[in-house]
Amino acid sequence: FGNASMYGGFCLAYVAYVSLKNKITDINQLKEYVELTFSPERVSFIKENIGNLWNVAIEISEEYSEAALLATVLWWQLQGNRFMGECETPQSVIKLANEILQISNDKVADFCSGIGSFLVSAIEKSPESQFYGTEIVRDVKEVSAIRTELISDRVKIEQKSVLNIKDNLMFDKIFCDYPWGIKAKDSIGSNEALQAIYDEIPEVQKVAAGDWIFIINVMNHLNKHGKAVVSVSNGVTWNGGINTVIREKFVKKGFVEAVIALPSNLYSNTGIAC
């Protein structure tokens, strides 16, 4: 699936799947189907990444089975930048999160859902649950929406900052693999979201890194008896100063059930442990 675009291979596989699924063998008919069927955002995403390779998509649809193309779309891997939020969560972390969360007929969220790898896995384990994802990057959001829509009609993916989710949107289970290295001042969404976090633990105002803002935001959207898994850099667990005070408050409030140390080099684009 050669293409200069980061998402070119994914789009070729997806359009090839659409072509085969709907028995479309003409380039113009395929373009028309895409434009009439999908949202303007989806159409733009496909056109920008597939370029002039519509004929290649049709050729691929004639070469591979529907099952093979579906598998390619569902398990496509993104090689991105961990610190820009464009790095796929490792399958080992996803498997661990699913084991901890034990999703079963729950309302489930993936904050900073990326290309939807956790949601795809969670849907397979508990198709009767309801799923929600939020991702700020348009192209990444489209990838996750495409993948999850193919296997469930009980999922909603929104393009927005995870810190701008409605206050009354609550979940039974939350997974969050947020982008590391973001400063607190750069990670804030609305002023209301900022104030809610500061009201919960005021010391967060004095921390430069944005980690605690993402973590507390998860807690703000968790039901009373809910459970969350948040992937953090290991510095969150041992940084001194005001971070020590914040950790103590988390423990005293009963927010922490366990801390699991994971090895370095789990993520493809950083050797930092989590």
Model-identified regions with their sequence ranges:
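Conserved S-adenosyl-L-methionine
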Residues: 80-183, 233-234, 246, 252-253
